[in-house]
Amino acid sequence: MPEHDVRLQQLTVWLDEQLNDLFRDNAWGEVPAGSLTAASSDASFRRYFRWQGAGHSFVIMDAPPPQENCRPFVAIDHLLASADVHVPLIHAQDLERGFLLLGDLGTQTYLDIINADNADGLFADAIDALLKFQRLPMDAPLPSYDDALLRREVELFPEWYVGRELGLTFTDAQKATWQRVSQLLIDSALAQPKVLVHRDYMPRNLMQSTPNPGVLDFQDAVYGPVTYDITCLFKDAFVSWPQARVEGWLGDYWQQAQAAGIPVHAEFEAFHRASDLMGVQRHLKVIGIFARICHRDGKPRYLGDVPRFFAYINEVIGRRPELAELGELIAELQAGARA
């Protein structure tokens, strides 16, 4: 029997025990007959199931060790809840085996419902939640978005996209260009004020809920650049917006962040430039990750969104002359791949 079927059997036995305890402790009566269905999976090894019965609904996370570790999720869930951010309530946990029984934040993500008409309201709620956790004191034992992490991320682009997807190797001149550009992006990120960073604060990880939004997938949180999450929110892997609207939303966030005491840049143009460069660093990383998911993990579907990230990068290059040589490098690589 495949290993994942064995895990599902183990999870089902564990879930039955936890539901019995949960219903007893809350005086809900006997556990009703329920259904366990696949809720979602993602680009990692984690997968999610939804249990529903007699008006009750829970989500179960299956995060198999050693590939996954539930402990950061649990710790950061409590941290965000302390800031009144709407995150799943953890009803039961088995950290050794990688099982969590969670409250259900609903079935509709922002990505499912967002459109040009409702985006202003949905993003206003997302900004409110972001400001809540950016106000938290930086005293939790979280990693720092330091030089090593930023560099490790950006190097995914030459390793996996250039090397594996395009099948190319940098020339000496291209390598020198890459080193200059990546250093510029890293220096800009490190120069920014620091806050708690979710790292994937995007519509796919925000649920339409009450209160809105429900926030998910925060287990990789770090302390890092103040522009990271807000840039991620508006320059998503799966949906794009006109630049004028993005700048308007960035301006709204910047003004509210200043009023809330978040350490953003004093001038909007400096904030906007930092956001632009932060976005390019993230986009290069994600292009590399999507190539890795394809070639290492056998999940090619994510490569279909790579052109969106190149469009984001090219848009920034058009207004940031300091990144002109990145545009030339990308053009050379794409021409080389076609040759």
Swiss-Prot record:
Signal peptide: none annotated. Disruption phenotype: Cells lacking this gene accumulate GlcNAc and MurNAc. Deletion of this gene increases fosfomycin sensitivity. It comes from the Bacteria. Its EC number is 2.7.1.221. GO terms for biological process: cell wall organization; N-acetylmuramic acid metabolic process; peptidoglycan biosynthetic process; peptidoglycan turnover; regulation of cell shape; response to antibiotic. It is an enzyme of class 2 (transferase). Gene3D superfamilies: 3.90.1200.10, Phosphorylase Kinase, domain 1 (3.30.200.20). Keywords: Antibiotic resistance, ATP-binding, Carbohydrate metabolism, Cell shape, Cell wall biogenesis/degradation, Kinase, Nucleotide-binding, Peptidoglycan synthesis, Transferase. It catalyses: N-acetyl-D-muramate + ATP = N-acetyl-alpha-D-muramate 1-phosphate + ADP + H(+); N-acetyl-D-glucosamine + ATP = N-acetyl-alpha-D-glucosamine 1-phosphate + ADP + H(+). GO terms for molecular function: ATP binding; carbohydrate kinase activity. Pathway: Cell wall biogenesis; peptidoglycan recycling. Sugar kinase that catalyzes the ATP-dependent phosphorylation of N-acetylmuramate (MurNAc) and N-acetylglucosamine (GlcNAc) at its C1 hydroxyl group, leading to MurNAc alpha-1P and GlcNAc alpha-1P, respectively. Is involved in peptidoglycan recycling as part of a cell wall recycling pathway that bypasses de novo biosynthesis of the peptidoglycan precursor UDP-MurNAc. Plays a role in intrinsic resistance to fosfomycin, which targets the de novo synthesis of UDP-MurNAc. Belongs to the kinase AmgK family. This is N-acetylmuramate/N-acetylglucosamine kinase. It comes from Pseudomonas putida (strain ATCC 47054 / DSM 6125 / CFBP 8728 / NCIMB 11950 / KT2440). The gene is amgK.
